[in-house]
Amino acid sequence: MIRVSQLKLPVEHSEEQFYQKIEKSLKIKRDQIKKLQIVKKSIDARKKPEVSIVYSVDVWVDKEEKILKHSGNKNAVCVKEKKYKVPEHGTERFNHRPVVIGAGPAGLFCAYLLAREGYRPLVFERGKKVGERTEDVLHFWKTGVLNPASNVQFGEGGAGTFSDGKLNTLVKDPLGRNRFVLDTFVSFGAPEKITYESKPHIGTDILSDVIAAMREEILQLGGTFEFENCVTDIRVADQKIKAVEINHNAWMETEVCVLALGHSARDTFEMLQKTGLFMEPKAFAVGFRVEHPQRDINRSQYGEKYAELLEAAPYKVTANLANGRGVYSFCMCPGGYVVNASSEEKRLAVNGMSYSDRGSKNANSAIIVSVTPDDFDGTDALSGVEFQRRLEEKAFALGNGKIPQQLFGDYCENKKSTAYGIFSSETRGETAFANLRGLFSDEMEQSFIEGMHSFAKHIPDFDRKDAIISGVESRTSSPVRIRRDEVFEANIRGIYPCGEGAGYAGGITSAAMDGMKVAEAVIRKYQPFQ
């Protein structure tokens, strides 16, 4: 096939214009095209007010080399179709079924691959099925009554279920895992456009249905799910995993245990540390969730002409400060909501979430400041966890259990806000005005303020006085890394640390890909379960 890149078209182009552009670029006629597939679609707004839609497409034709040479198009090349392949099965025999702890993206894709290959994984998830979990989350947002085992962090689908559902990743993968993840989502009900949009997202409403369909397929393939079953201990002998304890009262023997923990499984981290599993603190970032009117972001990114025509615009901003800290946007949610993402009593954390239509009137993003183990006495592997907890306890107290909010101008002046400016907050969960100064160290607070002013050089009025900040954004990534070797095993053999909670991913797609890598490691070593 021939891949043609840099096909620029007007924002409001027709299908006919799209085909004509391809025909012209390759100097071919319509009937010569046997098959066509969009590889990438992006918005180019670098030369505002002119904005273009840019495509890369794969075109199947006869006599590819001849057509390519005749076209003289420097943006066209012959490529071979790349399909993901599962490795050859190993020779060792299982005595017991492999266990996967956690049904987030890493755990689900690990279990899916194992189930497809006949390994009959047994998945333990402390939370509930996604439908029941959603009911618990909505109840929490309405009443403030938290279920510590079923919330925005815990339950089928993992923390990404209640997010923007972004599927882009910076992970380079020549083996095709990235495409396999996207194609798998499509096969379970996600829109096909996620396979080619430059910044794909799925939305929490669609993602919930996709996750449920994926679970049903894993069950059909011989896997098993045990919901509301938390792994509370492990049994180790001769530095090998022998069994896992469920809910403090039952043991399940296994020689393979995939730790697909989320970044909020703090009690599990504590339990694992006591067993002698090697783990270490890692750098992460904390800050606030910041809201702006989405229309203003659209104007900045697309220009006035296309502010209403195009989809809700994302942004990405970053600054490296003189004090050595980085300040940057994270998990930006166009047309999104700020949500109460707490999972522990008397502690409060926020996150951002969008539905598939990205229809909220506000844009929000975490604006976060980098922290290192030096900021939280990183001598203990779980010192970062305690740092997060202290921040969340302060946030809970500031809002009396509600999301504490403040206008950016008032934050700069160190005074409590009493009302919104010309736009109000879009939240899921109750809110209360508070003075958020004092939540972080003076240096971190000044870094946040400096970063906000810096970003206004790129996005006008980013530092507007009535921008709404909500605290605290503390769960940006795992504060620990569970060490693993080149075959993905921990120092306790048979334990496979995996995904975001173990410190090897950041986001839905990279976590899913890491789950696949761990499944491949198990497949290379063992025969399918008999």
Q: Model-predicted segments: where are they?
A:
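Residues forming the flavin
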Residues: 3-53, 57-184, 188-530
